[in-house]
From Swiss-Prot:
Catalyzes the condensation of ATP and 5-phosphoribose 1-diphosphate to form N'-(5'-phosphoribosyl)-ATP (PR-ATP). Has a crucial role in the pathway because the rate of histidine biosynthesis seems to be controlled primarily by regulation of HisG enzymatic activity. This is ATP phosphoribosyltransferase. The gene is hisG. GO terms for biological process: L-histidine biosynthetic process. Pfam families: HisG. Its EC number is 2.4.2.17. It catalyses: 1-(5-phospho-beta-D-ribosyl)-ATP + diphosphate = 5-phospho-alpha-D-ribose 1-diphosphate + ATP. It comes from Hahella chejuensis (strain KCTC 2396). The keyword Oxidoreductase does not apply.
Length: 211
């Protein structure tokens, strides 16, 4: 009997982009994930089930082996860290950029600066790497408001079109990295369940390459 494989999926935009890739890999939920209030879904493959989580929780579930595979944004993975995780595939979906931003036309501030972000670990590493002393302020959303209200000199946030920044009088400054969603695997699962996981990885790789 094949080992049960649990795949953790991120809610929202990433989920919408992930389902067609799973379908191309012959994995389809038996219920409509987008409409159902359930969080655990059986699939057309008797040994594969899907769980739908907050994006920031996906690496934790995979890291602890509760899920064997997961789909999460590179930003979430960089913030969480890779302990116990293996990243076999860039799914090339939900693409965007992680950038710094500040008030439009504002001169770069010398000395210690204040930075608002939900990506605290990434921001600490980024500014330290540039030799800039930065006080990092943790926020959970609405980053654009921080410079407007004088809470922060800069923000670190995900930028797609940049329209929200412009609408609030901000401008992007420096790109930290390009972001896309990645397939991650529990390191122990890759060894213990290799025979069951590798065919899924191969089919997903083919699906990504065919896009």
């Amino acid at each position: 009997m094949s080992a049960i494989i649990t795949i953790a999926l991120s809610k929202g935009r990433i989920l919408d982009d992930t389902l067609p890739l799973l379908a191309a890999a012959d994995i389809e939920p038996e219920d409509d994930i987008k409409k159902s209030r359930k969080l655990i879904f059986s699939t057309n493959q008797p040994n594969v089930r899907l769980v739908v989580l907050r994006a920031t929780d996906v690496p934790t579930y995979v890291q602890h082996g509760v899920a064997d595979l997961g789909v999460a944004g590179k930003d979430v993975l960089m913030e969480h860290g890779y302990d116990g995780l293996y990243e076999p595939l860039d799914l090339k979906i939900a693409t965007c950029r992680l950038m710094t931003a500040a008030m439009k036309g504002a001169a770069p501030k010398s000395g210690r600066i204040k930075v608002a972000t939900k990506f605290v670990n990434i921001a600490k590493r980024y500014y330290a790497g540039k030799g800039i002393q930065a006080d990092i302020i943790k926020l959970y959303g609405g980053m654009e408001l921080a410079p407007l209200m004088g809470l922060a000199d800069e923000i670190v946030d995900i930028v797609d079109t940049g329209n929200t920044l412009v609408a609030n009088g901000l401008e992007p400054r420096e790109k930290i990295c390009d972001i896309s969603s990645r397939l991650i695997a529990n390191s122990a699962s890759m060894k213990m369940k290799h025979a069951s996981l590798q065919p899924i990885l191969d089919k997903l790789a083919q699906a990504v390459g065919a896009e």
